[in-house]
């Protein structure tokens, strides 16, 4: 709910000394929607996000009443207010409609090409450029890109990273396909060899497409994204590596 989000986010800004960066996404899995708002299709989640953001921003400024398609509430406000006059806003975007919305609302961009090749990142940059042009060409949002990341210096650590990401991707496909095979919070891993189009999950493709490799290799990959126009890189660490393996990777990065 916009009022709940506004208050909780403002409180975080308060207790963190004004360090809030507020990010919104439309949701990933139908399983989430089935439990949080039964009857809502995941494909319609973006409509709620698009109505929510302007409401949250207005609640941070002062008294505000909302009469929308998905929420209605009388005059309300956020207590407390954020310490920052204008906290940095982020929108997770992968489709033209979301890039257009982010630019129209002065939001920055977070994108994630999954395990797909560099062409997917190029597609997202084109969508961003088209949205900026559509809105007059003066917008200058921060363009952030996320990739699973593992930096290693030997075959053993490389194999650990590949095995870890393979397990996580098998669980991801379970959730993505809404197979409802989740026990105590852990989705069953789908054998990737059973999937169509599984070439994107081949170890060589994973190592090529993701931010995997030696420090020197990773530097070259980051330079490619920098050349594309990526402003900030998001190190995606949640991939099942051991704690020691994750620390090694972070230090090498």
Residues covered by each model-derived region:
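Short, acidic/polar
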Residues: 4-8, 93-100, 215-224
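An alpha-helical appendage that flanks or caps ligand/catalytic pockets
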Residues: 42-78, 119-230
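Flexible, glycine-rich active-site loops centered on histidine and acidic residues
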Residues: 1-66, 109-110, 115-117, 163-164, ...
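Hydrophobic faces of well-ordered beta-strands that scaffold small-molecule active sites
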Residues: 20-24, 89-92, 107-112, 141-148, ...
């Amino acid at each position: 709910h916009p009022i709940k989000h506004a208050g909780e986010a403002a409180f975080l800004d308060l207790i963190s000394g004004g360090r809030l960066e507020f990010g919104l996404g439309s949701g990933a899995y139908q399983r989430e929607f089935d439990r949080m708002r039964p009857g809502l299709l995941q494909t319609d989640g973006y409509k709620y996000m698009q109505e929510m953001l302007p409401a949250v921003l207005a609640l941070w400024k002062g008294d505000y009443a909302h009469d929308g398609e998905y929420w209605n509430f009388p005059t309300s406000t956020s207590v407390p207010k954020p310490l920052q006059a204008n906290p940095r806003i982020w929108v997770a975007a992968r489709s033209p409609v979301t890039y257009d919305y982010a630019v129209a609302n002065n939001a920055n961009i977070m994108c994630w090409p999954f395990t797909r090749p560099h062409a997917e990142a190029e597609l997202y940059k084109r969508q961003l450029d088209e949205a900026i042009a559509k809105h007059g060409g003066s917008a200058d949002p921060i363009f952030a890109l996320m990739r699973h990341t593992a930096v290693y210096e030997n075959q053993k650590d490389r194999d650990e990273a590949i095995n870890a990401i393979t397990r996580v991707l098998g669980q991801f496909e379970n959730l993505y396909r809404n197979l409802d095979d989740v026990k105590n919070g852990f989705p069953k891993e789908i054998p990737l060899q059973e999937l169509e189009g599984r070439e994107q999950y081949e170890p060589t493709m994973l190592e090529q497409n993701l931010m995997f490799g030696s420090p020197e290799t990773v530097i070259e990959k980051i330079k490619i994204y920098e050349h594309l126009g990526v402003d900030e890189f998001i190190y995606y660490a949640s991939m099942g590596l051991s704690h020691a393996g994750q620390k090694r990777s972070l230090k090498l990065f």
